[in-house]
Amino acid sequence: MSELRKRNQAAIADLSENIEVTETVELTEKKPETTKSTKGHIIDLIICVSGIYASFLTWAVLQERIATTPYGPDNKIFRASLVINTVQSFLAAAVGYAYLQYKQSRRAAKGLKKNTTVFDSMYTLKQLSLVALSQSLASPLSYTALKYVDYLTSILAKSCKLIPLMALQVTLYRRKFPAYKYAVVVLVTIGVSMFTIFHAAPKKASGAGSEHQLYGLGLLGISMLLDGLTNSTQDQIFRKNADITGPHVMCGLNLLTGVFTTVSLLTFSRPQLDTAIAFIRLHPEIMRDIVLFGLCGAVGQVFIFQTLEKFGSVVLVTVNVTRKMFSMLLSVVWFNHRLTLGQWAGVAAVFGGIGFEAWMKMKKN
């Protein structure tokens, strides 16, 4: 039962991993700005990051409840993670559209152009479809990989998401980054990896034989590439269309993801849908937790896509990969927990990378 709960919890955690993504003081890759404008960007970044972190805390509570709490006298646990993902996608699409209407109404009130069309061109539709497809495939691959690789390998892979992201931006979309940006990415990746290595207790995967580990590593690698494709393509959408905002992408992406996962539930994953319907009939209270989980995810996505629109995917992914480390640092302060020497070295590497980027940005401005 503990193994089942661990897998189910990992699967639901991947739902937030897909939409989430992170924190550095690199504000944008646009032209140098005035000090006043830079301060405004810092405030915006703090608000976005605080919103993302707060939403993760709420997600964690509801995730724990759905993944581990037995429902009813028969003590059944809900295992239909794809159903949860589908509900969350449609709820986030609705919240995104409401937020889009609000932001565009404010633009119109200022005499600016109003654009409430989510798919304003075939290019936008194609790019969002690509993102939705890659995002929908990445989570199941990552979850399946847990059967063949150990826990430490899995979380180390998640710590290295910045590398495939930048690699795809350079090779696929011909983006150019200053040399210091590569150094920052390496420092942050090494720091988070060290923090993970010197903390995680080894946990065996259910199928962790040597003959299966190569297969599991392959699944993890494909999942990381799909994550990189998701985030780099989102960046490209904003760069190619000045009228596209965070709410546009949030609404369109979640709508398409919901459609894809619904098709999957009606075809390849029909047994999961049937099981979920039967479970909900017996334990209707599960719907309350699923809807609350979806709404919390939708609110979190408002901050996520605001970060993506204003600061880019590199910042967003950095927030994601450093989130666990900052959470543990808070526990050190509040509960007097102790970190190992290796973990402190990892923290120093992360803050060194962030501080170096901040210094380069101020020097540039």
UniProtKB/Swiss-Prot annotation:
Glycans are attached at residues 115, 231. Pfam families: UAA. Its main location: endoplasmic reticulum. It comes from the Eukaryota. One of its GO terms (molecular function) is UDP-galactose transmembrane transporter activity. GO terms for cellular component: endoplasmic reticulum membrane; Golgi membrane. It is found in: Endoplasmic reticulum membrane. The chain crosses the membrane at residues 42-62, 80-100, 182-202, 206-226, 249-269, 289-309, 315-335, 339-359. InterPro entries: SCL35B1-4/HUT1. It is a multi-pass membrane protein. May be involved in specific transport of UDP-Gal from the cytosol to the Golgi lumen. Involved in the maintenance of optimal conditions for the folding of secretory pathway proteins in the endoplasmic reticulum. Belongs to the nucleotide-sugar transporter family. SLC35B subfamily. This is UDP-galactose transporter homolog 1. The gene is HUT1.
